């Protein structure tokens, strides 16, 4: 099984840098799991609806999420990272 190729939006990178070091470590751990299996039950990966239709999200922990989309050639683009507030458009 090949690992998922991940690209990062400028917005995602900015948000990631603002996270606490502890949350950054949790996010990196979740990303490693995501690369191996984007639909691991530990990540609670789910489709988004409404204004975020076409995007997906997975859980870093109980409170924090990553919003992403599947792109060409089996890759994904990480759009946002943070608490549930990232769902607000």
What function would you assign to each model-found segment?
Residues 1-6, 10-14, 18, 57-89:
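Enriched for short, Lys/Arg-rich terminal
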Residues 23-37:
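Compact soluble domain cores
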Residues 33-57:
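A short, surface-exposed loop/turn module that caps and links secondary-structure elements
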Residues 15, 30, 51:
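Residues that form generic nucleotide/phosphate-binding pockets
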């Amino acid at each position: 099984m090949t690992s998922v190729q991940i690209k990062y939006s400028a917005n995602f990178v900015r948000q990631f840098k603002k996270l606490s070091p502890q949350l950054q470590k949790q996010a990196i751990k979740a990303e490693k799991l995501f690369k191996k299996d984007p639909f691991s039950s530990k990540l609670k990966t789910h489709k988004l609806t409404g204004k975020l239709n076409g995007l997906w999200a997975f859980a870093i922990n109980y409170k924090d999420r990553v919003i992403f989309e599947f792109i060409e050639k089996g890759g994904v683009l990480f759009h946002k990272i943070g608490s549930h507030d990232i769902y607000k458009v």
